[in-house]
Amino acid sequence: MAALQEKKSCSQRMEEFQRYCWNPDTGQMLGRTLSRWVWISLYYVAFYVVMSGIFALCIYVLMRTIDPYTPDYQDQLKSPGVTLRPDVYGEKGLDISYNVSDSTTWAGLAHTLHRFLAGYSPAAQEGSINCTSEKYFFQESFLAPNHTKFSCKFTADMLQNCSGRPDPTFGFAEGKPCFIIKMNRIVKFLPGNSTAPRVDCAFLDQPRDGPPLQVEYFPANGTYSLHYFPYYGKKAQPHYSNPLVAAKLLNVPRNRDVVIVCKILAEHVSFDNPHDPYEGKVEFKLKIQK
């Protein structure tokens, strides 16, 4: 018992550790001979090669089952969201206020529209084609260059008086501002059976002492042509541009906060979702001072 309980000195422990690292009598290093180290290394190399191969095969099979032309993440909403340009947000949503006689208050709004419509210049639309059918543009095959599908052109000049060319101020200087309404994209979404979706803007609460909101729409009737639908995704249609509708508000009361709602009227577009205020419509507060 005394021998078992005898404590080893530091030099003895160092000597044992050195013999464990390299034992000249047996030719072992760290408890194994060189040949055993070679065999165990080959075993682990083969093991991890096989495991990596199985993992790569699983990833390959998984990727083969995924359609590259279908987005990985899609919203559960059946109707597209609607956005507004210019978009100035306040504490409770879109809030736009400016003074007709002070250009510094609306110059930024006009600049926002110019910058947004730069993507709708003829040069930016060179990869798209002219469409005039006014019917759904179904494409089963990839006939466009680079195994893609064709996209229909939409240029800023289609917005006519709200394109920024005849009036670079977009009507802000005269108190008849232009606002651009855009529907978000949904892959393979069809807004209706045969009728083009239409934008309708009105006061949310009609002022008692004034007429209904008068709006001039561009393109005519405020419609999104059907040949821009369906959308097949960014990979299939890399040159696709959302169609736009511009609403020129003609009789907004001065020096008063008004709330305007622009709805998309179409058979397959709903705008009464209490949980999403931008589904199928967009609301914004507007105040024009003079």
UniProtKB/Swiss-Prot annotation:
Positions of the UniProt region annotated as immunoglobulin-like: 194-290
Membrane topology note: Single-pass type II membrane protein
InterPro entries: Na/K_ATPase_sub_beta, Na/K_ATPase_sub_beta_sf
Key words of the record: Cell adhesion, Cell membrane, Disulfide bond, Glycoprotein, Hydrogen ion transport, Ion transport, Membrane, Potassium, Potassium transport, Signal-anchor, Transmembrane, Transmembrane helix, Transport
Tissues expressing this chain: Stomach.
Glycosylation sites: N99, N130, N146, N161, N193, N221
GO BP, one annotated term: intracellular sodium ion homeostasis
Location of this chain's protein in the cell: Apical cell membrane; Cell membrane
Cytoplasmic-side segments: 1-36
Record-annotated disulphide pairs: C131-C152, C162-C178, C201-C262
Comment text on domains: The C-terminal lobe folds into an immunoglobulin-like domain and mediates cell adhesion properties.
Protein name per UniProt: Potassium-transporting ATPase subunit beta
Organism: Sus scrofa
